[in-house]
């Protein structure tokens, strides 16, 4: 259903790099400018948090435990995302970019320890949208989220 581990991890690195380049090239005054519901700063905090909890969620799945954040899935993770904005309040772009990198690197280092045989293993946990919740599915969520939010910034500010 999903790509093999190394392909997905390569895709994650690609979309992460593109997102980071967009944030680095963004004019400083636009980092805190509104995109409607949030700002590029908020999106950066969002990724610091999601990199961290994706690692935890993958670890929980390996133990056959539902990831703690699934409770908020039908709410589009609004409670989880709001918590990240409070938990990571910095408005310093360089600090947040560094934290995204540190948390992404920790996630990828952990994911590289997972055998391919466990990548799409069904441990009995069902994703709130149906079908098995797997490590591959968790990684796929990030692989789709980075470009989605990058495009949101590009659409608002025409930067690239």
Predicted features by range, described:
Residues 79-120:
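Acidic/histidine-rich alpha-helical segments that form the ligand environment
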């Amino acid at each position: 259903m999903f790509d093999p581990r190394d392909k997905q991890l390569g895709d994650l690195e690609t979309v992460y790099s593109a997102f980071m380049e967009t944030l680095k090239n963004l004019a400083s005054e636009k980092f805190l400018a509104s995109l409607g519901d949030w700002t590029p700063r908020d999106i950066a905090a969002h990724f610091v948090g999601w990199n961290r909890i994706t690692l935890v969620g993958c670890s929980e799945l390996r133990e056959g435990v539902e990831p703690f954040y699934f409770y908020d899935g039908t709410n589009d993770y609004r409670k989880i995302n709001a918590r990240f904005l409070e938990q990571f309040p910095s408005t310093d772009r360089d600090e947040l970019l560094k934290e995204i990198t540190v948390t992404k690197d920790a996630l990828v280092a952990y994911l590289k320890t997972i055998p391919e045989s466990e990548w799409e293993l069904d441990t009995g946990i069902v994703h709130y949208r149906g079908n098995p919740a797997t490590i591959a599915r968790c990684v796929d969520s990030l692989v789709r989220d980075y470009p989605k939010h990058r495009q949101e910034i590009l659409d608002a500010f025409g930067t690239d």
